[in-house]
Structures are given as C-alpha cells and as structure tokens.
C-alpha cells in the first residue's frame, strides 16, 4: 500500500461547491480500498464527504492538497487531479 499526494489549483468558477464536491465524492466512492484526504490551509476533510469538502471553502484560485493511500494510489490520485484540472466538467 502506498501513499501519494499532489497540490492542485481549483480552476472552476464556483470552486469546490455542492455539485463539484458530489462529483469528487462519486469518483472517490468508485475507488476500491482508497483512503482519500483533501487539505486546504491546514484543514482536512475526507475525500468521501461532500459536506467536509464544502466546509474547506476552496474557491477558484485556491490550492488544495489531495492525499491518496491505497494499492493503486498513483492512478487514483491522477484521476482526481484530472477531475479538478478540467474544472469538474463545468463551464
């Protein structure tokens, strides 16, 4: 089991709001055996918690750190980074 992390810039207009958080949580839920944590300004939330992610208050231009622990952590982290880098598929 390995643990990897990456710093990611929030690029979508509304930041980590309800819909974006739900997409993130849905992606995490599909990751068998992964433990995902998201951190902003020393505050952390479980990657599987919509409310926890929203409480981080990550807005456009903010930087968050995603940490993934699991047997396929690098691939799973890349998938989450891509989701954020593409603005959660929003305009």
Model segments located where?
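C-terminal structural segments of small proteins and small subunits
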Residues: 55-91
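Alpha-helical protein-protein interaction elements
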Residues: 8-9, 16, 75, 80
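Intrinsic-disorder/low-complexity, polar/charged segments enriched in Ser/Thr/Lys/Arg/Asp/Glu/Gln
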Residues: 3-7, 63-65
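Compact, glycine-rich, soluble single-domain proteins
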Residues: 9-52, 56
């Amino acid at each position: 089991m390995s643990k990897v992390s990456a710093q990611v810039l929030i690029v979508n207009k509304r930041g980590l709001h309800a819909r974006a958080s739900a997409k993130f949580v849905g992606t995490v839920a599909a990751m068998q055996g992964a433990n995902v944590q998201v951190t902003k300004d020393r505050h952390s939330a479980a990657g599987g918690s919509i409310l926890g992610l929203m409480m981080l208050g990550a807005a456009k231009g903010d930087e968050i750190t995603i940490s993934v622990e699991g047997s396929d952590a690098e691939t799973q982290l890349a998938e989450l980074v891509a989701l954020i880098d593409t603005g959660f598929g929003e305009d």
